[in-house]
């Protein structure tokens, strides 16, 4: 009887784990679509300074998060304020660089290079967390960079400045996502989102001082859409990281590249060329071979 109870408890735990993983996957899919819509909204308003986009996005996020925090009570009180501030700083840096990349690159290309985030996260783990950086991870990083070079070298519409901003986005996001993964152990998801928005407000205001202009007409609509989709993406991403391993969440997030390429077609990017597709394929392959080692080690 004790043995049967033990098996029953084990089955229930396994079922709950599968359900949690399924919920996490759904959250990540919604996050990927939200971020693709955010990128499309940003691309539709090229005349609005990018620091202004970050400011208005953060202002909308503060209002929406305050409404969502109603009822969270003491759970929303920050436990690690300094770590929250660092996560917010790198999140701000990554978001600003992302908007700069979107202005200079086809939408699908910018999102593809951004998805090198986990490769940079692995390198950061070696440098700052004393994690082993194996040969397969070095290979995956080189293959990924090769994919970026292929996209740039054979695509005349892709500039090195745009590629640089996209790589900066991936690097800053790697730091921010690593901190989010740690913060979700003690912080309410909305607390993490609120900290990001609150810190981004003064940073974007200072960074864009003197270059601001009043949005006109439909620019207000796209700025509002940018704020709402970024908010939904941040909330869904934070919830996904509560249920999924970072590597699994990143793998599901690759769907965002497909969303971005499809959205980019009516925005004037056209159908992706062979160079872009081949470069994207190399980047995806690099992420796959880099993840294989992590999967093998986690199963031991």
Where are the model-predicted features located?
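C-terminal-most transmembrane helix of multi-pass membrane proteins
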Residues: 2-5, 254, 258-300
């Amino acid at each position: 009887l004790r043995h049967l109870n033990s098996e029953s408890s084990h089955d229930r735990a396994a079922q709950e784990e599968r359900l949690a993983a399924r919920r996490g996957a759904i959250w990540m899919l919604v996050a990927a679509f939200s971020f693709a819509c955010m990128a499309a909204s940003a691309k539709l308003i090229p005349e609005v300074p990018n620091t202004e986009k970050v400011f208005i996005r953060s202002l909308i996020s503060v209002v929406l998060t305050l409404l969502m925090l109603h009822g969270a009570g003491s759970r929303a009180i920050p436990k690690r304020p300094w770590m929250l501030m660092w996560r917010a700083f790198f999140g701000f840096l990554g978001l600003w660089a992302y908007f700069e990349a979107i202005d200079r690159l086809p939408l699908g290309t910018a999102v593809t290079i951004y998805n090198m985030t986990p490769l940079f996260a692995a390198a950061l783990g070696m440098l700052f967390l004393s994690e082993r950086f194996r040969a397969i991870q070095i290979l995956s990083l080189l293959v990924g960079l090769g994919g970026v070079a292929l996209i740039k070298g054979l695509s005349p519409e892709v500039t090195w400045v745009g590629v640089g901003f996209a790589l900066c986005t991936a690097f800053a996001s790697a730091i921010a996502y690593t901190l989010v993964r740690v913060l979700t152990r003690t912080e309410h998801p909305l607390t993490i989102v609120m900290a990001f928005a609150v810190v981004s407000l003064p940073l974007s205001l200072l960074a864009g001082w003197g270059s601001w202009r009043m949005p006109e007409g439909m620019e207000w609509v796209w700025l509002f859409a940018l704020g709402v989709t970024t908010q939904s993406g941040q909330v869904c991403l934070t919830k996904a990281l509560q249920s999924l391993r970072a590597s699994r969440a990143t793998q599901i997030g690759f769907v965002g590249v497909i969303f971005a390429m499809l959205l980019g077609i009516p925005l004037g990017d056209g159908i992706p060329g062979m160079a872009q597709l081949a470069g994207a394929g190399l980047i995806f392959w690099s992420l796959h071979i880099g993840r294989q080692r992590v999967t093998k080690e986690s199963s031991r």
